[in-house]
Design a protein with these regions (language model features):
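Multi-pass alpha-helical transporter architecture, strongest
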Residues: 201-226
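A late C-terminal transmembrane helix in Major Facilitator Superfamily
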Residues: 145-191
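A membrane-interface helix-boundary motif in multi-pass transporters
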Residues: 185-206
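Extracytoplasmic gate region of multi-pass secondary transporters
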Residues: 11-64, 124, 128-129, 181
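Helix-to-loop junctions at the C-terminal end of transmembrane segments
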Residues: 62-75
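C-terminal transmembrane helical hairpin of 12-TM major facilitator-type secondary transporters
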Residues: 76-127
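Transmembrane alpha-helical segments of major facilitator superfamily
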Residues: 51-59, 170, 174, 205
């Protein structure tokens, strides 16, 4: 209900996972929107719309793999390594951009983005699995010493409700964040003549997601290991 939605907005786990979910789900949206424009701008001799569907298609296909891996290895660890890949891929794409005296490499550029799309897809699945586990775990801890099965079941229901509310809110935040990617490309090109600045910025953002995942959820003594 509305009360649960309002309460969850004040929860720090809500904002942590919104940050990470923006890195995966938001990136999927933004990359899909911005990739054709970026290729056509940097490699004008190529019609990017002939193959622009490949990245989003691969991301959608591998999303279930992220959930499957999260169930077996742990969502936080999968998400951590996904953000490692996502931090490197934009720098690789920037390396293959055309520069003065060089035509760049379309193949290298596209492959770097394919890696970014696949990582975003897998990470979308793994972060999606993390959210309900986080809130269920926190609620279970509150009644763990009561030795009361009814209290435990009630706590799990509350955790499930909070997890569902967080998924909805995080999805909205991530979708909004996804619109930033094409805007960042355009701004970088307008100011510097190249999207390289935007790509470096994205790499730094994914690095922050990687470090956040490790600190909050992946390390052995994390607040909520999942």
């Amino acid at each position: 209900g509305f009360a649960e939605q309002v309460a969850i907005v004040r929860h720090k786990q809500q904002w942590r996972m919104s940050w990470l979910y923006t890195g995966t789900f938001g990136s999927f949206i933004g990359l899909a929107a911005g990739f054709p424009m970026l290729v056509n701008t940097e490699f004008p001799a190529v019609d990017a719309f002939k193959f622009a569907f490949i990245g989003p298609l691969l991301a959608a296909l591998v999303r279930p793999i992220g959930g499957w891996l999260a169930d077996r290895v742990g969502g936080a660890m999968i998400t951590f390594w996904i953000f490692v890949v996502m931090a490197v891929a934009p720098l690789a794409a920037a390396y293959f951009l055309p520069r003065a005296g060089t035509e760049g490499s379309l193949i290298g550029f596209v492959l770097a983005f394919v890696a970014l799309f696949i990582a975003a897809g897998v990470g979308n699945g793994s972060t999606f699995r993390m959210i309900p586990i986080i809130f269920r775990t926190l609620r279970e801890r509150e009644v763990a010493n009561q030795n009361d099965q009814a209290a435990m079941e009630a706590a799990r229901r509350v955790g499930s409700t909070e997890g569902a509310a967080t998924l909805g809110f995080s999805s909205a935040v991530a979708a909004f964040g996804g619109f930033f990617i094409p805007i960042a490309y355009g701004t970088s090109i307008k100011l510097t003549g190249s999207p390289e600045g935007a790509l470096v910025f994205f790499s730094v953002f994914y690095l922050s997601c990687m470090l956040g995942t490790w600190r909050w959820y992946a390390r052995r003594d994390a607040e909520v290991a999942c």
